[in-house]
Amino acid sequence: MNHLIVFAHPTANSFNAAIKDSIIKQVKMHKQEFKIRDLYAINFNPILQYNEILDFQDKQYSPDIAFEQQQIQWADVIYFIYPTWWYSMPAILKGYCDRVFAHGFAFTSTPDGPKGLLHGKKAFIFETAGDSEQSLIQRNLKQSMVQVLDVGILQYCGIEVLQHKIMPSIHEIHTNQHEQYLREIEITVQQQINL
């Protein structure tokens, strides 16, 4: 099984980085193949230019995007790891989705509507948030945070989302809660590998 980690946090010593390391630990332990796309480390350009939109119609992709698409094609399971910024994903990850999950690669148009082209792939989303769970639920933000990436992007492209784990109050919780989150993530990855 091939595992692709799409990591969108600018800090190497963040809790998001600990999540990434926990996934890598499990994947290595089970002798699985994995690749990491650290969007900040590779200085990914998130800006979708108009000429790219035109090129997508002819399935013409710039070399950097074609490379990222090859990573998606290679993967059986994709992990998205990112912090919540303004109740959404960081702009660098949104730009990654805008540019990489392009028309002709990730989805196409049919007389019956859009059709996803990435069926058979699975995704896990691990998202940290500074806000409390109660606050997210009271303001209906939790559902909107899930809808955008899970339904509006990944499922639209045919990818099955197996879990979207939002970890709230990430800056206020104690170390033992961080460790509990990491254990839960390791179990999730292990269960996926053992399927």
Regions found by a protein language model. Give the residues of each.
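N-terminal beta1-alpha1-beta2 submodule of the flavodoxin-like/Rossmannoid cofactor-binding fold
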Residues: 1-105, 169-195
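A generic structural signal for alpha->beta connector loops
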Residues: 31-33, 120, 158-161
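Short, glycine-/small-residue-rich phosphate/pyrophosphate-handling segment
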Residues: 108-156
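Hydrophobic residues at beta-strand termini and immediately following loops
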Residues: 37, 126, 164-167
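Generic secondary-structure boundary/loop-capping signal
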Residues: 41-44, 102-104, 115, 151, ...
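Glycine-rich phosphate/pyrophosphate-binding loop and the adjoining helix
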Residues: 136-195
